[in-house]
Amino acid sequence: MPYVTSPDGCRIHYSVQGAGSTPVVLVQGLGLSSRFWFDVPDRLLAENSDLRIVLPDNRGTGFSDRSPKLFRVRTMADDVARVLDACDIDAAHVVGISMGGMIAQQLALRHKSRVKGLVLMATTPGLPYGRLPPMKSLATLLTMPSKLRKEESAIHIAKLLLPEAEWPRAREIFDGWIDLIQTSPVEPRAFFDQFAAVCAHWTGKEIADISCPTHVITGDSDALIPPKNSEWLSQRIPGAELHVLAGVGHAIPAQDRDVVARTVSRLIARVGGGTAEAPRKVA
C-alpha cells in the first residue's frame, strides 16, 4: 500500500483510481477514511474517463497512522500536499466535505499552486466568522464514537446527518456506509484528535486569498454545519459559486449521489475556459 511520511513520522496512506491526465483529490470529513466516498470515484470516472482520483486517509483514519501528537487542520493539508508530491501531481482539483473542506481551504491557502479548482461541501471558515452547530447536534457528534458499534447507530447518525423527514430511510440512503463504520470505526482518541483540530480551525479574512475557481455546496437542512457558513465562504472567495441543495442535510454525497461528478465536471469546464465568474446562487 502506498504511504507518505510526514516530518513528525506519521505515515499517510492513499490510493489512486483511474489513470487519466486530470487529477482530482477527494478529502473526507471527521473520523472517516477515504472509503467513505464509496461509489463517488466510479461515478466521477463514468462522467469523465480522463480523471485520476487520489484518495488520502486523513491521519488517524483508514490505513494512516494516528498522529504522535496533537495537530492542526493545516497539518492535514500539508499531508495532502505530500501525497500530491508522491503521485507526481503538480496541481489538482480538490473536493472536500466538512472537515475535508477545511483541509481543502488550508491546502488552497498554503499550497496555492497545487490547487487548480476547489469544491467545498458542507464546511466552514471556523470562528469567529462561521456559525456553530446547534448544541443538540454538537452533543450528538461528541457521543458518536461510543455509538458506532451499537445497533441503534443508524438512527444516531441519521439525526446528525440527515433531515428529519429522511430518518426512516437512513439505512437505504447510507447504503453500506453504516456497516463500514460499524465494522471499522475510528479509534475514539483519533476521532477527538481530529475534533480538536476542527475546533482550532479558522481561515477568516485569508479566505479572500483563494484564487482558484471554487464551487461551494450546502444542504438547506444541514444541522451540523449551518448553511450560513457556505454562504459566507461563497461571498468572500472571489468568483465562487454557491449551490444550495433543497431537502439535503450534512451527508451531501449520500443524499445526492451524483453531485460530486456534476460539480467536478462544471469545475473542469470553468478552469478550461479560463474565466472567472461572478458569485451567484444556484438552487
Predicted regions and their residues:
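Conserved HGGG/HGGXW glycine-rich cap/lid loop of the alpha/beta-hydrolase fold
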Residues: S6-R66
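Active-site loop/oxyanion-hole signature of alpha/beta-hydrolase fold enzymes
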Residues: V54-V95, R262
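Gly/Ala-rich beta-loop-alpha elbow adjacent to hydrolase catalytic centers
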Residues: G96, G100, A104
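Flexible "cap/lid" loop of the alpha/beta hydrolase fold
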Residues: L109, K116-K147
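Conserved alpha/beta-hydrolase catalytic His-Asp/Glu region
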Residues: E151-A197, G204-E206
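Short beta-strand/loop motif that positions the catalytic acidic residue
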Residues: I210, V216-T218, D222
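Conserved alpha/beta-hydrolase "acid-adjacent" motif
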Residues: A223-N229
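Catalytic active-site module of serine/aspartate enzymes centered on a nucleophile-bearing elbow/loop
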Residues: A240-A283
